[in-house]
Amino acid sequence: MADYQFQRVIRFGDTDAAGVVYFAQLLSICHEAYEAAIAALGIELRSFFSDRGSVILPIVHAEIDYQRPTYCGDRLEIELQATALGRDRFRVDYRLSHNHQPVATAQTIHLCLESQTRQRSPLPERLQDWLQITAD
């Protein structure tokens, strides 16, 4: 599996007063795709995203470039690919499209920290496996 595929219909609450998707909402939708990819590994999201786990994975960088507007009712296709950036961080690249037309590209960089000490920590084995799968 080179890329993880995710689909999301744009809802009215995703849009602004002009009727297009609010700019920051596309990053939120990218995070939904990331969560779905993690869940597809069989990782339980509640513990994965809480301080009760052994590590946390905060986003330390995010960027997005928009190619065209999207509207309520549009079905977005989101492809994501994750890449290791050393032993304690990784990047997720997102390609968003509607009807096979590019909508946006985005990127997030995540850093692995021990949840209690907030010190850098190696990526957990299951996450390393995911990075390997999406890199193939």
Swiss-Prot record:
One of its GO terms (molecular function) is fatty acyl-CoA hydrolase activity. It comes from the Bacteria. Disulfide bonds: none annotated. Pathway: Cofactor biosynthesis; phylloquinone biosynthesis; Quinol/quinone metabolism; 1,4-dihydroxy-2-naphthoate biosynthesis; 1,4-dihydroxy-2-naphthoate from chorismate: step 7/7. It catalyses: 1,4-dihydroxy-2-naphthoyl-CoA + H2O = 1,4-dihydroxy-2-naphthoate + CoA + H(+). Keywords: Hydrolase. Its EC number is 3.1.2.28. One of its GO terms (biological process) is phylloquinone biosynthetic process. InterPro entries: 4-hydroxybenzoyl-CoA_TE (IPR050563), DHNA_CoA_hydrolase (IPR022829), HotDog_dom_sf (IPR029069). The active site is at D16. CDD domains: 4HBT. HAMAP family: DHNA_CoA_hydrolase. Catalyzes the hydrolysis of 1,4-dihydroxy-2-naphthoyl-CoA (DHNA-CoA) to 1,4-dihydroxy-2-naphthoate (DHNA), a reaction involved in phylloquinone (vitamin K1) biosynthesis. Belongs to the 4-hydroxybenzoyl-CoA thioesterase family. DHNA-CoA hydrolase subfamily. This is 1,4-dihydroxy-2-naphthoyl-CoA hydrolase.
